[in-house]
């Protein structure tokens, strides 16, 4: 029997629980496909994708993809991506934890599609640095810039996020960064949100999306 060679690509597999096609004006420019990874370092109280914390075997829609198998699946919308300037948005979960997968996927795209990443930035620095050269649009959900509010809402320390945010602020292509600042029921106030936005503007961010979280309805 011929031995199967394990290439680097074969070793880069990622659990994905959603591939949502033909999205418009929600995840970046043009028509996009949203790809959502399993796994997240945060435990947000009003998480809208709570399945990202489950094991892949417990998520009916989830399966393991290689960069190439995902590429083949999403290529069916190639004409829409190219006609509208769209592409793929990686979310989750926390997509930066799958930076190697995204790097390999980007090589397969060969620059034809835009790559957008929606992230909390609460990750080690190398996860961000590895993707800075190839991501076309960053969408950052900061939760809140107040450390106490952040800790209560996410269950995590704010420090990693702030360090990564400083790194992004120093990035030469700041226009490619959208910062999402949520009103979080029971956790922050309008005053807190205004304070977060003021601090972000001081850092140099200009594309700021203020919105309101909705509490998930309990069954």
Model-found features: residue ranges?
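N-terminal [4Fe-4S]-dependent radical SAM core
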Residues: 1-64, 76-82
